[in-house]
Amino acid sequence: MTERRIIHIDMDYFFAQVEMRDNPKLKGKPVIVGGKASSRGVVSTASYEARKYGVHSAMPMSQAHKLCPNGYFVTSNFGAYRETSAQIMSIFRSYTDKVEPMSLDEAYLDITELVRPDLPASKIAQYIRKDILEQTHLTASAGVSYNKFLAKLASGMNKPDGMTVIDYQNVHDILMTLDIGDFPGVGKASKKVMHDNGIFNGRDLYEKTEFELIRLFGKRGRGLYNKARGIDHSEVKSSRVRKSVGTERTFATDVNDDEEILRKVWELSGKTAERLNKLQKSAKTVTVKIKTYQFETLSKQMSLRDSVSSEEDIYNIAYLLYNDLKDPDVPIRLIGVTVGNLEQSTYKNMTIYDFI
């Protein structure tokens, strides 16, 4: 039986990072997302600069203001977060259909079928993080292991912008020394019960019998018993049927030079063709999307009689669509090429290994 390989990707301070990307003046500042300092809401996300003051998620905004009076308080922009999340999930699905999103900014990926001797799971995780950085200008942390529990644990161990691998060689040492509050799923209430019963770290948990843990925590006790031993048989659950494949790029500065933009369209067409070939699919619609310097999103789609899958065919259609969309007086900050209405190709295509 092939050993499973699971990646857990967790975006770093996602909401705050999106705000800092879209407003460079916020970069390096203590950014607190959730609302005005005077509001009755709670903190959604705080940048690492704000966390140094003790600000954290779910904290009342009023308390965050007391701790960090010079912080930059930003109202949540869920439209931008959802749009960026969709980009990130699309990147995940360009590698595998076995993707289980847990929220806008984190997901599990089962990449067991992609791993081979010269392409370990850690390298695939690096490629995914690189794609996220190039396409969204955001950093992500990754955990790699042989089950979901350990992959999630690993993703939080080297933040921000880091990666940790937990394997059979290091799992015991990591779990035994882990603070009980750092076990995924152990909240404040559970932590108090743990402490009241002499459980302060993974070793203490490991030394409890399954019966003792069930007595303390009910059905959850069996799960805690398994976690102390690094056991988790849960599957990566994905019910999504792929409907489209695409790639977007945000320019470092706003651009209105056709030659530069079309070079990017060619690059995106190639990336999209690679992903189609990996899936052994072809497409009957092509869409080009642009976002102007004023953050206005425009798109145009063409439906085709015959399906396409090659870089040249996708580019030729994208070229026509871009020319219909463009306004020479309006610089753009983002361009994307997406193909949809997918169908199975009638010939053997290349695989991911031809493109990595």
UniProtKB/Swiss-Prot annotation:
The keyword Magnesium applies. The record marks 15 as: Substrate discrimination. SUPFAM superfamilies: DNA/RNA polymerases, Lesion bypass DNA polymerase (Y-family), little finger domain. It is found in: Cytoplasm. Its EC number is 2.7.7.7. GO terms for cellular component: cytosol. Belongs to the DNA polymerase type-Y family. This is DNA polymerase IV.
